[in-house]
Amino acid sequence: MKESNYKYEVIVVLNPKAESKEKEKSIKQIEDKILGLDFKVENREDMGSKVLSYKIKDQEKGDFWVFTIGGNKPIKSKEFKLFLNRETNIIRYLILKI
């Protein structure tokens, strides 16, 4: 299989007060959006719940997830960021090119 030319790490902080079904739904939607952008999820890791340095959307804790994704073209960051901003259970995200 051909190796991906473009690799990114997407770090997502989910609302810790959301129910587990809602979190699973959000994670599934993130993966579906990644696949819709012609990328594949190479790795998905639950980093657990962590105390935040400062409050974000009135939350003092967050559930951290890290997705390593790869594709053969640059990610459409505007479209992906718009999706992440509209997802109600995501309180913060970071997209890094690796």
Regions found by a protein language model. Give the residues of each.
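Long, contiguous binding/interaction regions
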Residues: 1-62, 70-98
